[in-house]
């Protein structure tokens, strides 16, 4: 197993490698087959690894994936690619309004972890909030609680604040689906949409920039879903019924339906892949 780390230094990478190093020492057979490497963007080095690979697991943007896939590999090499994806949250306004204070606090903390912790940069972080059974009082109750919690936990970087304001101005100029925009402070920007359009996934927020829409029915969402849609985080929603509706609609996207707070919980099933199965070779004897 050869893992190429990002060429930039991040303290999280060092911490994770240290932890993995401690654990992997208990399993010598795995340790001697595993290496973490770092090198500048260099197709010659990557090509040398690709030529010997049985599996290429590629994380990155669409352009990065296309670049790696273009490098020669053995005829039986399996590619598992994790490309650009888009995620959203589906909240029930009446459920938010009826929630006890402790339930609301838990919801807000979970939502914060799904969004602000990664500045919405993760592919599974919701960019747009869809409200079913929309209730203005429920919506305001939610956002007031999010604002109060984020003020205590989130440090808004100057560059992020500038980017958010620039994005808001660009939306006001070019987004024909924009209905209204709300910002009490620089912490949270809310852009309400008057309709869902086929280019929904082009609208992405970062650092507390959220799109919102009052959903008439699930079919309205399904009409704009593409293969780019990954995770739907839910609150107050019948997840089993929603999952059945997604399957029945034979959508090309929406691979994960999880509670708010579980957006980042990666497992052996990701992006619609069963990773253990796809990374295994099966030997069958009759």
Question: Whereabouts are the PLM-identified features?
Answer:
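Conserved small-residue-rich beta-alpha loop and adjacent elements
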Residues: 1-24
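Short catalytic-loop micro-motif centered on adjacent basic/acidic residues
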Residues: 3-4, 55-58, 232-233
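Conserved NAD(P)+-binding/catalytic subdomain of aldehyde/semialdehyde dehydrogenases
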Residues: 27-128, 133, 261, 269-286
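Short, conserved catalytic or adaptor-binding loops enriched in Gly and charged residues
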Residues: 26-30, 71-72, 202-203, 248-251
